[in-house]
């Protein structure tokens, strides 16, 4: 894995999980 590429995406996805209660990818 490229830390620079995956690190930012994973952080964004984790942040979205807080809002994405339905798990459908939309807030």
UniProtKB/Swiss-Prot annotation:
GO terms for molecular function: calcium ion binding. It comes from the Eukaryota. Ca(2+) binds at residues 20, 22, 24. Gene3D superfamilies: EF-hand. Residues 7-27 form the EF-hand domain. InterPro entries: EF-hand-dom_pair, EF_hand_dom. Keywords: Calcium, Metal-binding, Repeat. SUPFAM superfamilies: EF-hand. Belongs to the calmodulin family. Calmodulin mediates the control of a large number of enzymes, ion channels and other proteins by Ca(2+). Among the enzymes to be stimulated by the calmodulin-Ca(2+) complex are a number of protein kinases and phosphatases. This is Calmodulin.
């Amino acid at each position: 894995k490229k830390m620079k590429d995956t690190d930012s995406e994973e952080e964004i996805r984790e942040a979205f999980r807080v809002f994405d209660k339905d798990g459908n990818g939309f807030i």
